[in-house]
Curated annotation (Swiss-Prot):
Any single biological process term in GO: translation
Phylogenetic classification of the source organism: Bacteria, Pseudomonadati, Pseudomonadota, Alphaproteobacteria, Rhodospirillales
Function: One of the primary rRNA binding proteins, it binds directly near the 3'-end of the 23S rRNA, where it nucleates assembly of the 50S subunit.
Family: Belongs to the universal ribosomal protein uL3 family.
Protein name as annotated: Large ribosomal subunit protein uL3
Organism: Rhodospirillum rubrum (strain ATCC 11170 / ATH 1.1.1 / DSM 467 / LMG 4362 / NCIMB 8255 / S1)
Post-translational modification: Methylated by PrmB.
N5-methylglutamine: residues bearing it: Q151
PROSITE patterns: RIBOSOMAL_L3 (PS00474)
A GO term, aspect molecular function: rRNA binding
Keyword annotations of the record: Methylation, Ribonucleoprotein, Ribosomal protein, RNA-binding, rRNA-binding
GO CC, alphabetical: cytosolic large ribosomal subunit
Length: 235
């Protein structure tokens, strides 16, 4: 099981295939994604890598976190996430991952926080049809109607779909297709939409419900390996 990546949502655009059909894609940027810490079975009871991405200002980083980053010899990071990995996919602290970690055609799971919508009614939040426009209905056209209880049980069940806060929740979209990657610019293009607003941090992992395709770098798509391959081609 490989590590994932921390990426930042840039926005949406579209690509055209050779046949002329367009594919809507979301652009994700991988910036300074490095290993900050390593968890091993001997010391922690499980195996994982802690990644950090983005470059944070030193004055906005706590003293404890400054020491944490200094131990790994990396710059302060804006976002830190831990990914569970198998023992053969552990990485060294300070190692930098690139967009080449994923390949075109691969399926990935992307986790993030959805855009907050504030307090929303039942029609917007749960797609209720609302009440009648006429026939005695007044004022309450967009209400959710009866909550379905009587003297017994004399309460509204937990989880009842009603008006309330909408959005700003953590979700994972599964089995999204990687259309293309650009390791030089640190870009990953994923088909369709992903959770979050532009600029939001996302966790990109290998899809748990799909097999890894051939050509996926193991244990990870390290930036040093990509640069070495480019230098070899120039020579």
């Amino acid at each position: 099981m490989r590590s994932g990546l921390i990426a930042q949502k840039v926005g949406m655009t579209r690509l055209f295939t050779d046949e002329g059909t367009h594919v809507p894609v979301t652009v994700l940027k991988v910036e300074a994604c490095q290993v900050v810490a390593v968890r091993t079975s001997e010391t922690d009871g499980y195996t994982a890598v802690q990644l950090g991405a983005g470059v944070a200002k030193v004055k906005r980083t706590s003293k404890a976190m400054r020491g944490h980053f200094a131990a790994a010899k990396v710059e302060p990071k804006k976002k830190v996430v831990e990914f569970r990995v198998s023992e053969d996919c552990l990485l060294e602290p300070g190692a930098e991952l690139s967009a080449a970690h994923f390949v075109a055609g691969q399926k990935v799971d992307i986790a993030g926080t959805t855009i907050g919508k504030g307090f929303a009614g039942a029609m917007k939040r749960h797609n209720f049809r609302g009440l009648e426009a006429t026939h005695g209905v007044s004022v309450s056209h967009r209400s959710h109607g009866s909550t379905g209880q009587c003297q017994d049980p004399g309460r509204v069940f937990k989880g009842k779909k009603m008006a309330g806060h909408m959005g700003d929740t953590r979700i994972t979209q599964q089995s999204l297709t990687v259309v293309a990657t650009d390791a030089d610019r640190g870009l990953i293009l994923v088909k369709g939409s992903v959770p979050g607003a532009d600029g939001a941090w996302l966790e990109v992992r290998d899809a748990v419900k799909k097999k890894l395709p051939e050509g996926v770098p193991l244990p990870a798509g390290l930036k040093a390996a990509v640069e070495a391959a480019v230098d070899g081609e120039k020579e």
